[in-house]
Amino acid sequence: MLRVAGRRLSSSLSWRPAAAVARGPLAGAGVPDRDDDSARGRSQPRFSIDSPFFVASRGFSSTETVVPRNQDAGLADLPATVAAVKNPNPKVVYDEYNHERYPPGDPSKRAFAYFVLSGGRFIYASLLRLLVLKFVLSMSASKDVLALASLEVDLSSIEPGTTVTVKWRGKPVFIRRRTEDDIKLANSVDVASLRHPEQDAERVKNPEWLVVIGVCTHLGCIPLPNAGDFGGWFCPCHGSHYDISGRIRKGPAPFNLEVPTYSFLEENKLLVG
């Protein structure tokens, strides 16, 4: 029986706070006087009940905790996590002892520091400008593409009344050497009756030579030279007729044949583009 009683006593002591155990023996261990009982009843912690089951059940209560109170045990006896739960504090306390403090700078060196920072920013801005310019210029046409943008044509081999076709920027270009009759016929047309009114002098730089892009203005077909009702070009796709000056005279095309940018380098040298 003494052995069983000792086990019960040790189990009840393991659930009591350390401070409560240090204050005195459990109730019933001895026969104290009446004054000691009243004093112990006032100072006895609330979790000094002998039953371990009852103490554990109180831990599930929303208003009670199995962690000892401040008056029962010191914070030094508890782990850091338990102390944080026991005394929550919304104020953030920074550890200033683990951070190195630097003394304030010398005011006489601030001008040099500002100069270095400003110079660095200027260098960074210049590098950024060069990168932006390089990126923008990389999207422009290269030299070989620009060389193909212009086309030089020798006109000495073209007979009067004939038309030659050259390729410029992926499009056909019609170059026609007109005769005197062709020039008179182009100038005799009533411009007011045309769908897209243009004088013949507005479409040529030299009346002998007519230079137009060989793409129909309707749906982009290639007209046939020396064909149609007006002796110019005829589009076989939808039946558009152009005269000797490349102006639309009949059919669904809304505009005249486009005149590219060109110039005469010499009497028999033509530069398209």
UniProtKB/Swiss-Prot annotation:
Cofactor(s), by name: [2Fe-2S] cluster
Gene Ontology CC annotations of this record: mitochondrial inner membrane; mitochondrion; respiratory chain complex III
Reactions catalysed, as given in the entry: a quinol + 2 Fe(III)-[cytochrome c](out) = a quinone + 2 Fe(II)-[cytochrome c](out) + 2 H(+)(out)
Transit peptide, start-end: 1-61
Binding site for [2Fe-2S] cluster: 216, 218, 235, 238
Keywords attached to this entry: 2Fe-2S, Disulfide bond, Electron transport, Iron, Iron-sulfur, Membrane, Metal-binding, Mitochondrion, Mitochondrion inner membrane, Respiratory chain, Transit peptide, Translocase, Transmembrane, Transmembrane helix, Transport
Residue stretches in coiled coil: none
Cofactor: how and how many bound: Binds 1 [2Fe-2S] cluster per subunit.
Topological domains, Mitochondrial matrix: 62-110
Subcellular localization: Mitochondrion inner membrane
Keyword hit for Mitochondrion: yes
Single GO biological process annotation from the record: aerobic respiration
Membrane topology: Single-pass membrane protein
InterPro entries, sorted: Rieske_2Fe-2S, Rieske_2Fe-2S_sf, Rieske_Fe-S_prot, Rieske_Fe-S_prot_C, Rieske_TM, Ubiquinol_cyt_c_Rdtase_Fe-S-su
Alphabetized PROSITE patterns for the sequence: RIESKE
Note: The Rieske protein is a high potential 2Fe-2S protein.
NCBIfam families in the cross-refs: Rieske_proteo
Family, per entry: Belongs to the Rieske iron-sulfur protein family.
Record's subunit section: Component of the ubiquinol-cytochrome c oxidoreductase (cytochrome b-c1 complex, complex III, CIII), a multisubunit enzyme composed of 3 respiratory subunits cytochrome b, cytochrome c1 and Rieske protein, 2 core protein subunits, and several low-molecular weight protein subunits. The complex exists as an obligatory dimer and forms supercomplexes (SCs) in the inner mitochondrial membrane with cytochrome c oxidase (complex IV, CIV).
The protein's name in its UniProt record: Cytochrome b-c1 complex subunit Rieske, mitochondrial
Species this protein is from: Zea mays
Classification of source organism: Eukaryota, Viridiplantae, Streptophyta, Embryophyta, Tracheophyta
